[in-house]
Amino acid sequence: SIISHREEIFNDKQSLFGKLFGILILFLLVAPGVISNESAKTSIAPLMLWVFLWIGVPVLGLLFGDIYAKFNPLNLFPVSSNKPQSVYFACVLFIGLTWFELVWRKPGNPLNIGVVFMLLFISVNLLRYFLKKSLIEVDPLLLLHYLYSKLKLINSRPYFRSLLDNIGNLARLRGIEYFVLLMIG
């Protein structure tokens, strides 16, 4: 039998700087479309979403660990929650984000990006507040970036050993296999 180190699944504490950066990110995603209705060619919202959040942060997470959790724009309010049990809500919200990206007409439109992120922000925080869910159970972007960070390329321990430990720790969350399949698909 192999005894492996078990770590805390997730800690959602943010520094003041992280919260301020998260507010800035949320503002840059929502304001250009909702407040000023900028065109997609001149707006920063599509750049923030498609280049920074979908590509840049996961690549940085592969190198430096879970940096998205440090400034998560959906984690602005402190909410007491239970220990993470499942990620089914995150799976459903991830399907919604994927539908927005692949099916919805004009996913690069700043107004559409603003509306989607306002809905995501409200959904995540209502689930956290009323159902006492932990952030990693309901935030699909956090779970996505967290999974990428668990594949971290730079480790002080042997790579495959730490990768197996990380995967073993994640297996305790019900529904994680569905989220991984959605992520791959």
Q: Regions from the language model: what does each represent?
A:
Residues 1-185:
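Transmembrane-helix bundle segments that line or gate the permeation/cavity pathway
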